[in-house]
Amino acid sequence: MQLVAALAALGALVAPAVAYPHAPMNETLVDVQLTAVGNTMVKATITNKGDSVLNMLKFNTIMDENPTRKVMVFQDGAEVPFTGMMPRYLMSDLTEEFFTTLAPQASVEHSFDIATTHDLSAGGKYVISASGAIPTAEEYSTTITSTALYESNELHMEIDGTQAAAVEQAMKFTPEMQSIHSRALQKRTKIVGGSCNQNTLRATQNALGNSARLAQAASRAASQNAAKFQEYFRTNDANAKQRVIARLNSVARESSSANGGSTTYYCSDTMGGCKPRVLAYTLPSRNLVVNCPIYYNLPPLTKQCHAQDQATTTLHEFTHNPAVASPHCQDYAYGYQQCISLPAAKAVQNADNYALFANGMFYSLFTIIF
């Protein structure tokens, strides 16, 4: 009852207008150049333009080894839909294996096949570009202290559609899974029961309930608390605020029932996306969410400010689904310091800003009441 009372009162929480510390956001520290090295193969050359060593976290960047959204692909001015995964990573106790170290003026190359995460079977002329933010740590450290924004060159490619169609998609959807997914959508079933055991089903249902309450309360806070909205989304523009409120309300609706909604939810992995440190992932092209084994190691609802838990991970993943709110959110940055350092245009489209805002609003009230 105390938790319900805290969530119900959350929207009324008023904070003083104060300044908040930022992790530095450097727009000139990293250079990214794209070149074509095959029909659909792209090479990214990442250069440290600074005068000190950079330890760069690879999660959700151009260097990510998983089939994440590394580039934007356009044909005739329209973006080609992304068919890969949008994961939420466990950000505590990071180890050096997830970083790439670059000396000053040094470069590293990372190649990937864009046909594994985009349907390029139409062939023809495409324009490819990349933009994002790389969390950085100091040499010999894995503590994130800064973030480097990057904007690549525009790469123009002439792609053979037949060759592109022969490339296997990274996220495999078997006929059996397609049948399960279709039945789930026809019945408007959110949780695919066959993917759950008793414990994971209970945890997922509980997370959905908490996600709904957090999103509802955060929506109220967004409309009533200008200082906190400014803190997390870097603006108080009326249009931006309405977009955030609408998205939070949509997440609340999607989370509110395990038997009706626009997404399909799996308690366990079905496509091999649960790589190291992945808590959960979304396939935005299919409005599908998957929990990974380490998701269930998180607390259902944390009492720590800006810590990860099951509820905000579910909330985070729902913002990635276009059926919940369009355009769906991206993964521009992770963690409080990095997210509040994003420019407003990216902050309102970044999934973790929503999860952190919901958590931060709940934690602020929780510490006052308890």
From Swiss-Prot:
<protein>
    <recommendedName>
        <fullName>Probable neutral protease 2 homolog ARB_03949</fullName>
        <ecNumber>3.4.24.39</ecNumber>
    </recommendedName>
</protein>
<dbReference type="InterPro" id="IPR001384">
    <property type="entry name" value="Peptidase_M35"/>
</dbReference>
<dbReference type="GO" id="GO:0006508">
    <property type="term" value="P:proteolysis"/>
</dbReference>
<dbReference type="InterPro" id="IPR024079">
    <property type="entry name" value="MetalloPept_cat_dom_sf"/>
</dbReference>
<feature type="binding site">
    <location>
        <position position="320"/>
    </location>
    <ligand>
        <name>Zn(2+)</name>
    </ligand>
</feature>
<dbReference type="Pfam" id="PF02102">
    <property type="entry name" value="Peptidase_M35"/>
</dbReference>
<feature type="signal peptide">
    <location>
        <begin position="1"/>
        <end position="19"/>
    </location>
</feature>
<feature type="binding site">
    <location>
        <position position="331"/>
    </location>
    <ligand>
        <name>Zn(2+)</name>
    </ligand>
</feature>
<dbReference type="GO" id="GO:0005576">
    <property type="term" value="C:extracellular region"/>
</dbReference>
<keyword id="KW-0964">Secreted</keyword>
<dbReference type="GO" id="GO:0004222">
    <property type="term" value="F:metalloendopeptidase activity"/>
</dbReference>
<dbReference type="InterPro" id="IPR050414">
    <property type="entry name" value="Fungal_M35_metalloproteases"/>
</dbReference>
<feature type="binding site">
    <location>
        <position position="316"/>
    </location>
    <ligand>
        <name>Zn(2+)</name>
    </ligand>
</feature>
<comment type="function">
    <text>Probable secreted metalloprotease that shows high activities on basic nuclear substrates such as histone and protamine. May be involved in virulence.</text>
</comment>
<keyword id="KW-0482">Metalloprotease</keyword>
<feature type="active site">
    <location>
        <position position="317"/>
    </location>
</feature>
<keyword id="KW-0479">Metal-binding</keyword>
<keyword id="KW-0645">Protease</keyword>
<feature type="propeptide">
    <location>
        <begin position="20"/>
        <end position="188"/>
    </location>
</feature>
<keyword id="KW-0732">Signal</keyword>
<keyword id="KW-0862">Zinc</keyword>
<keyword id="KW-0165">Cleavage on pair of basic residues</keyword>
<keyword id="KW-1015">Disulfide bond</keyword>
<keyword id="KW-0843">Virulence</keyword>
<dbReference type="GO" id="GO:0046872">
    <property type="term" value="F:metal ion binding"/>
</dbReference>
<feature type="disulfide bond">
    <location>
        <begin position="274"/>
        <end position="292"/>
    </location>
</feature>
<comment type="similarity">
    <text>Belongs to the peptidase M35 family.</text>
</comment>
<feature type="disulfide bond">
    <location>
        <begin position="196"/>
        <end position="267"/>
    </location>
</feature>
<keyword id="KW-0378">Hydrolase</keyword>
<keyword id="KW-0865">Zymogen</keyword>
